[in-house]
């Protein structure tokens, strides 16, 4: 390469480098190179120059209001209620008893008082009977709970049912007391306050 070419190349390189540095350090009268608003030492007043107009004001300076952030929706809360199945159903049955209906009336009232996302009804049984029979019985019980809640005005698309049969005991199945505790319906309500 000859000397004029080297000189032209060096000059072009210097121009490109200088323009990059200049643009990186370009600061209008409102922000520093890092994008922060320049303010006085007490952080109360914004710096501006003679070209400032109210139309060029930025939020947080010179009376220009800061845009309000939209309110975040409260996170859904979950409440889990466990009902003994003996309260809802007779032994080996899936038809709701009057006491069970009264409790489900309270559940429906709670569900209507919130911005409901979902209700999950999970039926459980004790260990008496075959696994397949108990699974079907627990599913029928959960379906009865759903049908009743739907009859009380709860959206059926918001209610999910599941039967666990005898798979999730919370007490020993060796005693009558333990078996009674294992015959249960768990109802979980998920939603947020209105």
From Swiss-Prot:
UniProt GO cellular component terms: cell outer membrane; pore complex
Membrane topology, from the record: Multi-pass membrane protein
One Gene Ontology molecular-function label: porin activity
InterPro entries (UniProt xref): Bact_OuterMem_StrucFunc, OMP_bac, OmpA-like, OMPA-like_CS, OmpA-like_sf
Compartments it resides in: Cell outer membrane
Chain ranges of the OmpA-like domain: 77-193
Similarity field: Belongs to the outer membrane OOP (TC 1.B.6) superfamily.
Protein name: Outer membrane protein A
Higher taxonomy: Bacteria, Pseudomonadati, Pseudomonadota, Betaproteobacteria, Burkholderiales
């Amino acid at each position: 390469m000859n000397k004029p070419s080297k000189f032209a190349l060096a000059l072009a390189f210097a121009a490109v480098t200088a323009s990059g540095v200049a643009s990186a350090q370009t600061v209008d009268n409102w922000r520093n190179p890092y994008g922060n608003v320049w303010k006085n030492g007490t952080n109360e007043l914004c710096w501006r120059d003679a070209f400032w107009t109210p139309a060029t004001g930025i939020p947080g300076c010179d009376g220009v209001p800061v845009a309000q952030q939209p309110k975040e929706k409260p996170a859904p809360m979950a409440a889990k209620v466990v009902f003994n199945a003996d309260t809802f159903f007779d032994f080996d049955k899936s038809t709701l008893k009057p006491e069970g209906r009264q409790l489900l009336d309270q559940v429906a009232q709670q569900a209507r008082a919130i911005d409901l996302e979902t209700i999950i009804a999970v039926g459980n049984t004790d260990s008496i009977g075959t696994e397949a029979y108990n699974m079907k019985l627990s599913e029928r019980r959960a379906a009865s709970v759903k049908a009743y809640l739907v009859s009380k005005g709860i959206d059926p698309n918001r209610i999910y049912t599941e039967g666990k049969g005898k798979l999730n005991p919370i007490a020993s199945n060796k005693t009558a007391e333990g078996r009674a505790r294992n015959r249960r319906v768990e109802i979980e309500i998920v939603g947020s306050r209105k």
